[in-house]
Every structure is written in C-alpha cells, then in structure tokens.
Design a protein with these regions (language model features):
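Conserved GNAT acetyl-CoA-binding A-motif
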Residues: 107-120
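A short beta-loop-alpha structural element at the N-terminal edge
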Residues: 1-11
Length: 166
C-alpha cells in the first residue's frame, strides 16, 4: 500500500465493522472514537505499521493492515494487531484470503512471530481467519480474540552446482 493510500484506512475500518443482519449500521463517525482511531491515526509512523491493498483500477477496494497497538485484539507489546476489510461488492472473491496470506508472508520475512485480531462472533470473517490459521485464544461475550503464529516456512532448496541440479 502506498503512503498516499493510508487515508483510505479510516473508511476501510468502517467497512470492517460487523453489522448483524437486521441491525442498522452505525454512523460513519463511529470510526472517530478513540478505541477505533488507533487502527489508522498516524499510520506509517510505527515500527510495525504494515499495509497491503487490493486495487481495482486506481481505487483501493480492500486492505489488510497491522500495527503494534493497544486495541481490542491486544495480546502483548510485541504482537501486532491486524485489521482487514473489503468493500462489500468485492467480498467472497478470494481477495481477502490472498491479502491475508500475503501479509503473513511479509511478516514472516520480517521476523514477526505472531499476529492477533479481534472479530465479532457472528462475523462470517471468522471462517476466513480460521482457514488462514488463526485460532481463538480468548473471548468476550461479543468477540473472539484470535492469534496466528507465524512459522518459518520449511522448504526444499535446490542448488545448481557445476550444471548439476542437486
């Protein structure tokens, strides 16, 4: 995600708010509450502020981002908390899965050991988070706190020595 696109995080955070079927969505001003502003205010200034974007043409249509913050999904001072959102018309197409996997790969390369998030229990995204390896480590009456341990990939490395593939 380009620095000039960080301004979209506030709007995307609003899109990440789960609204149960039949409930009215909250006003957009809800994103200005202090407990939600920590997700986007000053983004890019923290040591583990990272964001990836899905773009359609020149429009950012979704993002996954993380940072060290004392938020709903806070585990400890070394575990970044993650947020993910797509505009509704882009959901269900695998974009969120790809963004999450790309973020996990990027964090692994940086040596990050784990990442957390909070999600409303009724949010269909719970299935997505489980599918990419998050597990529930704590819960409240309304939400799950989930954690994904980021393990170094074990791979097979091939070397080309004197024209021989070993």
């Amino acid at each position: 995600m380009r620095v000039e696109e960080y301004a979209t995080l506030k709007d995307l955070l609003y899109e990440a708010i789960y609204v149960p079927p039949g409930d009215a969505p909250p006003p957009r001003s809800v994103a200005d509450r202090p407990e939600l502003r920590v997700y986007f205010q000053g983004f890019g200034s923290g040591p583990l502020d990272r964001a990836l974007a899905a773009v359609d043409g020149s429009r950012v249509v979704g993002s996954v981002w993380c940072r060290l913050m004392d938020d709903y999904g806070h585990i400890d001072d070394e575990t970044p908390s993650l947020a993910a959102a797509l505009y509704p018309e882009y959901r269900g197409q695998g974009i969120g899965t790809e963004l999450l996997r790309a973020m996990m790969d990027a964090l692994e390369r940086e040596g990050v050991r784990q990442v957390s998030l909070s999600v409303q229990k009724g949010n269909p995204a719970v299935r997505l988070y489980r599918r990419v390896g998050f597990r529930i480590v704590r819960e409240t009456a309304e939400e799950y706190i989930m954690l994904k341990e980021i393990e170094e990939a074990v791979g097979i490395y091939l070397e080309l020595l004197d024209g021989l593939l070993i």
